[in-house]
């Protein structure tokens, strides 16, 4: 039976950033993931939503295409997104580059964000390496995801960065997602486990051996794993082209 997928953005309630956690994860050590970016987005319908992302160059953040909006503000160097620290760098996005063939709740869910100013690289703010174009990471690997998404479907929000280890699954585990494409996407999270990415985690990185291999894309509204992540390696030529031209 086909079940509708759910983009993993988080609606911001009462005009404030009320982000939560990854389901089944633990709180990250503060500033142990200096590449993490918290995105505050105003949509074309004037709604405020949140996504994750990650710094790949001092002036570029990589995220999911469904996190596009009328305006985007990026916070770097954050741990507790509701408690401002000296480590914070808040930067405006001046241009959004969603992949040209992006299909909502489908494939090509990847986007580059050009920052108005270059981030200052510090102990709390740094870049994350990307895989080469030829990389094809296979099922069975254990990887890590981090984000400020909810702890559960009905759980109260938390504000600190969370992380969880998730297994890369065989493509058949994502067969209930009609648009799933194993060549362009990753099936992430053991169906027998409760650990998963959820609302607010969209756009965050999947780390395998310290390299960003995927981007949180969509999952079931029940939060039951697995979820679908965009593979990064097939898009390296496009990423490199955008970075070179900007």
From Swiss-Prot:
Residues 22-244 form the Peptidase S1 domain. It is an enzyme of class 3 (hydrolase). Disulfide bonds join 51-67, 143-208, 174-187. GO terms for molecular function: serine-type endopeptidase activity. Residues 1-19 form the signal peptide. It comes from the Eukaryota. Its main location: secreted. Keywords: Disulfide bond, Glycoprotein, Hydrolase, Protease, Secreted, Serine protease, Signal, Zymogen. GO terms for cellular component: cytoplasm; extracellular space; intracellular membrane-bounded organelle. Glycans are attached at residue 120. SMART domains: Tryp_SPc. Belongs to the peptidase S1 family. Granzyme subfamily. GO terms for biological process: proteolysis. The keyword Cytoplasm does not apply. This is Mast cell protease 2. It is found in: Secreted; Cytoplasmic granule. The keyword Glycoprotein applies. Its EC number is 3.4.21.-. Putative mast cell chymase. Pfam families: Trypsin. The active site is at 66 (charge relay system), 109 (charge relay system), 202 (charge relay system). Residues 20-21 form a propeptide.
């Amino acid at each position: 039976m086909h079940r509708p997928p759910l983009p993993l953005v988080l609606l911001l309630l009462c005009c404030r950033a009320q982000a939560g956690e990854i389901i089944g994860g633990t709180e990250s050590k503060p500033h142990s993931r200096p590449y993490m970016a918290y995105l505050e987005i105003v949509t074309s319908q004037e709604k405020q939503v949140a996504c994750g992302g990650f710094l790949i160059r001092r002036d570029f953040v990589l995220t999911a295409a469904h996190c596009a909006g009328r305006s985007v503000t990026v916070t770097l160097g954050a741990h507790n997104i509701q408690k401002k620290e000296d480590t914070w760098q808040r930067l405006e996005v001046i241009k959004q580059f969603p992949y040209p063939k992006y299909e909502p709740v489908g494939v090509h869910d990847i986007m580059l964000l050009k920052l108005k100013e270059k981030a200052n690289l510090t102990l709390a703010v740094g870049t994350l390496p990307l895989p080469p174009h030829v990389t094809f990471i296979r099922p069975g690997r254990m990887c890590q995801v981090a984000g400020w998404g909810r702890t559960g479907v009905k759980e109260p929000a938390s504000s600190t960065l969370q992380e969880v280890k998730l297994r890369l699954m065989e493509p058949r585990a994502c067969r209930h997602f009609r648009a799933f494409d194993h060549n362009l996407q990753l099936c992430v999270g053991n169906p027998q486990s409760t650990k998963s990415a959820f609302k607010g985690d969209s756009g965050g990185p999947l780390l395998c051996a310290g390299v960003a291999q995927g981007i949180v894309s969509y999952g079931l509204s029940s939060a039951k794993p697995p979820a679908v992540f965009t593979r990064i390696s097939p898009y390296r030529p496009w990423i490199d082209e955008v970075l070179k031209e900007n």
